[in-house]
Amino acid sequence: MRIKNDAIFDGSKYWSNGLSKKYKPKWRKSPFDHVWYCLVRNQEQMDKALESLGSGWKEPFKAIPCAALVTSYQVANERTYCILQIGDTSDWNPSAIMQTLVHETAHIWQRVRSAMREDQPSDEFEACSMEHIFQNMLDDYDRSQK
C-alpha cells in the first residue's frame, strides 16, 4: 500500500512556492575541505557560481533535461567544485523535493569520496558526511524559496 506523500511530510509550513529574488549561492565545504559545493535554482545563479570560480566557464542551467543534477568542476588541479542544480519546484510535493535533495547529496558525497581517494570510508563517517552535506543543501534550498 502506498502512503500519500503529503501525509508523510507537509512542507507547506516550511516552503512557499516560488524562488527568492534575494538568494545568492553560497559555497559550502565538505568535511576536510576536499570539495566545495553550492545549490543554484536558475541560470543567473549558475552564472554567478561559475564566475566565482574564476575559470571563465559558461554552462547552461540544467543542460540535461532532468529534475536536478550535480555538475563538477576542477580548478587548477586543486579543488573540486560541485553545483547542485534544481529548478522550479512549485508543482512538486514536499516528499519529491526531499527525495531529490537526498539523491543529489549522494552524488556530491561520491565526488567527496573520490577527491579523498577513499574507497571504503567507515559507515559512520559516510553517514555523517552525507548528513552534513544534505543539511547544507536543505538549508540552501529553504533560503532559495520566497
Where would I find each of the regions flagged by the language model?
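Active-site recognition of the HExxH zinc-binding catalytic motif
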Residues: 99-111
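Short helix/strand-bridging catalytic loops that position acidic/His residues to coordinate divalent metals
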Residues: 113-120
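A conserved mid-domain beta-alpha-beta active-site/ligand-binding segment of alpha/beta enzyme cores
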Residues: 41, 49-52
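Active-site scaffold of zinc-dependent metalloenzymes
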Residues: 53-95, 108
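Short, conserved micro-motifs enriched in small and acidic residues
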Residues: 95-96, 100, 121-125
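Post-HExxH zinc-binding segment in Zn-dependent metallohydrolases
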Residues: 120-146
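Structural signature of transmembrane alpha-helix termini at the membrane-water interface
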Residues: 7, 109-112, 141
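N-terminal low-structure segments adjacent to metalloprotease catalytic domains
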Residues: 1-45, 89
